Structures are given as C-alpha cells and as structure tokens.
Amino acid sequence: MKKTISIWAPLRYANVGDDMQAIAFATYIKKLGYNVKLFQLDEELSNLYDLKSVRTVDELCKDVNLVIIAGGALLTPFRWYKRILNKAAREYEADFKDLYLATKKYPSVKFCAISMGGDGKVKKPETWYSHWRIDFFRSESFINGTVRLSGDVEQMKQAFGKNFAYHADMLFRTPEYFEYDLLPKTDKIRVCLQFKKGRYLDKKLLSDIYKYAEDNDDIEFHFITTHMPKIGLTYQYVPNKQSKNIFIDTYKSPRQLLGVLASCDVTITSMLHVGLMGLTVNTPFVSYRGPGKTKSFLKSIGGEWAILPENISFNELREQILIQNKEDLYKQYNQDIISEMIEDSKNQYEFCKTIVEKYS
C-alpha cells in the first residue's frame, strides 16, 4: 500500500506562485511512488493536475507522518496592527494557529518547509509575527528545511533555533513540471504588465500606455494578475475593458499564465515570483517599484539595468526596454549565474526526496 505525503500551502488565495510550488512538489512526490494530498487546492486545478485536495488541517494530518510546507512567503512580516486590521493578515496568522494546534493533536507528524520565502533579512520575531507563528516554527514537530534566499538561513537560526539550508528557488525548474499554451503569433511587441494599485502605480505612466496603445499598433499590453479573480483580492491593477492592444490575462491556471509570460517579449512587474516565472520560459523581466528582494535578486544575476527608476516615463520605458530585442535583453543578465541557480534549484527537490524517504 502506498504511503501518503501531505502538502500544506496557503492555497485558498489561489496565488500562482503558491499553486505552482505546491503542484510541482506534489507531482515530484507522486513520481517517487507516493500518494499526495494538498491543502485547499482550487478544485479546477485539482482536476487539471489530478491531485487530491482536502479542506481542513485535520484531514491533511490524518494517516500521514509528514506534511511538506510548500512555500508561500512564510516569513512575511506583519506589524501587530496589520495582524489585527488586515483581513488577509489575520487569516494568515490564523493558519499558523491551526498548524501549531495540529502539532499537539498529531505529535507523530513532522512538518518541513522547503524553498520557504522571506525577505532575506533578520527580524525580531516578536515584533513581526504572531505568537502562533513563532510557536509553530519553534516546535519540535517543525523540522529543519530549506529557504530560497540566503539571508533567511540566519533568520531561521536566530529567531527559531532551526538549521535551514539555502538553495536557489525551486521554481527555476518550472519547465520540468508545467506545460503551457502560447498565445497566437503576432508581429507586434508583446509586453506583460503586473501592477499593484495605489502608490505602486504612476497614473501618468498608465495613461501614457493607454494613449500609445490607442494611437499606435506595434505593441500589445497584457495586464496579468497573480490571483484568480473569484478569490476577490483586488490589490492588482487590471483595465476595465480590453481594446485592440490592451488585453486582460487574469490568472486561471499555471498552464495559462505561463503561456502568456512565454509569449511576451518582456515582463514589467514588482513581484519576484512573476519575474522568475518569466525567466524560466526565457522572457526577461524588469522591476517596476518592486521590493528589496526583487531588486536584490536582479542585482545577483547582473540585472541592475532591469531595476527601473521609480518615476520612469513611458517614452523612456519604450526606448530603453520595450523596443529592445527579447533575446538581447535576456543576454544582459549574467547567464552563468542563472545557469548555476537553475542547477542549484535541483537541490530543493533532492532535499524533498530525502525528507520524504526519511519521515514517510
């Protein structure tokens, strides 16, 4: 009889990065000969990738010895007031309460985070995390795992007393686990745009994009989101309607969104995992008002040129990035470093195999 491995991630938010990490590990573990069940994977994705999904932590922990924590930005810091006032932050910390209580109810079950995300900086846990998150990470049931930013090794050691290893992000192996459907061919330049609302978006830049798309016919602008629309998270910008050169490509599945990214000549995003997904299908990305970790990653691959000025104009963006050849842009990164990261990311999967064989 096959043993079963469980995979936990915050999948109810239907975020493409979390979905892909959980699905990739599930696919890998199934190929090793195990059954797999995932926590709250979207029903359509469950059917598409033939993966079992369960709704509760109890169902996840029953009849297993190991729960893989498949990423998500588990070290995301929240100020105390955000943990009270922000619904998503409250729910996220409540997840850790459920996980911690599960360590008490199922003492034989081990929890292991693989390719876990933070911002690479050491933070005082009591300032940034709920006591449930702290208690879970410090519990004996939560065993040593891996992180995807080297700075988080020290965070896990200092804050939680855990010895984590660093390897490059497991999503570097995306093409091995996900097929995708390309958009119809076109002679136009295709630009993928992922914008956050509010202070993360320059209204003048947006207005100029619309004007250019209306007055010219050489560039298509594809606006993407990283959450499925049915989840109701609306912090990312999408147009009200499509037009001849304005397209709305909200996230439906990894297959669909990877196809959009692969079909574009460049991705403009604030999110590291969106840019990384694009890189794996040979689409260069530039950071627009992105956080420190996105900029740090670009610097690490020789991509200082890809960190856009905060108030870049559309004309500057067009001349410096949009009309440049796709292959030439990609070659501006340090190819040797990217190749090393792709190779090192294999170790995330090898670590997964070792843990599964040891604790299943």
Predicted regions span which residues?
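Active-site anion-handling motifs in enzyme catalytic cores
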Residues: 1-360
